[in-house]
Amino acid sequence: MINFNEVLETNKMIEQENLDVRTITLGISLLDCISSNLEELNQNIYDKITTVAKDLVTTGKKIERQFGIPVVNKRISVTPIAMIGASACKTPSDFVTIAKTLDRAANTVGVNFIGGYSALVSKGMTSSERLLIESIPEALAVTERVCSSVNVGSTKTGINMDAVKLLGQIMLDTAEYTKEKDSLGCAKLVIFCNAPDDNPFMAGAFHGVTEADAIINVGVSGPGVVKTALESVRGEDFGTLCETIKKTAFKITRVGQLVAMEASKMLNIPFGIVDLSLAPTPAVGDSVAEILQEIGLEYPGAPGTTAALALLNDSVKKGGVMASSYVGGLSGAFIPVSEDQGMIDAVRAGCLTLEKLEAMTCVCSVGLDMIAIPGDTKATTISGIIADEMAIGMINQKTTAVRLIPVIGKKVGDIAEFGGLLGYAPIMPVNNFSCDNFVNRGGRIPAPIHSFKN
């Protein structure tokens, strides 16, 4: 029987505590669009996306009205374009035409982001994958809604250090191409280890080749709800703390499951997964950092931060798994700097460093996310940071990622303004001791011993 108090509680979560469905992401396979003729390929891609996704935005709005739950973003992910363009694209410029087509299709159907301008190169790069990677800076500069990701490592295959080296330079080039907007292009580029096929969150979403022709994946956001729940158990022991987070995560995920099933039914597209992630926004009261403070830290970055984040992440998963028949994506707690006011405050207070953020990524959901660094940082230094983060994912059998923003023309202490959901970020210092000889070795780092399960 429905408890009236729980109805009021859910209503309060939405009205006062920033509970929302962050994204309904429609994954679309473009494998049947492949052609050796570039013009024909672009037309096929545009036609497929605008046909399959034509009702996505209106469906999201209908669900909002029906349940009173904000559905903040409606998005699309597609099959990695390095595969789709392999026959037709002979130069980086050819791939850029596909990026423009994706942007046009996204604009036509009304979604705010389209992910999948991607390459999966964890063991090696084909010529088309290298061309796509080389096209990323221009592609992200000439489009508004296209997001790019590159998977450079996995627990099963090791880390492709040739790709890591190349991407250090690509990240700087992307920053240079968009320097008039505080190097915003880099906010739409994610480097992965163990990238999931069903991630609904941008900028790392792509539609994996293991997926159906089309699929609905949903991501929910509720850091404010968790923080409010923890306010009622101040001073209690860790068992009570974890139990409170679990119960709250269950309720949050149940909302995502409801929306995902309804969207699937209305669009007649199979339901894929609910992503259990706690995704913050720059809004006050919608912060993962504030949860960590409520757990007992003065600021994120203080001693105990990694343990507090591990506890939070694990409890969210335990509660969320009970609420949905299928969970997936990234599933945990995001710790982006620019998208979380509490993280920004911690950086400004001198409590949170790049190295501490790296330690936190060992126990959380993604990785070094939305971190602004000086624009004069060397490409090899960026590659070294990427390699470190990929190693954490490879050894620990988890998804890790890097979304750094080298802001051209800015130095430590300056502020980079990205606007909207991406927020703003203080420029953080980077360790500038050289790793050139390490990065320049080339080849790949072998898979760890515990990857051999057969």
Curated annotation (Swiss-Prot):
Family: Belongs to the UPF0210 family.
Family matches, as PANTHER family: UPF0210 PROTEIN MJ1665, UPF0210 PROTEIN SPR0218
Superkingdom per UniProt: Bacteria
Alphabetized HAMAP family for the sequence: UPF0210
Quaternary state and interactors: Homodimer.
Organism the protein comes from: Lachnoclostridium phytofermentans (strain ATCC 700394 / DSM 18823 / ISDg)
Name of the protein in its database record: UPF0210 protein Cphy_2797
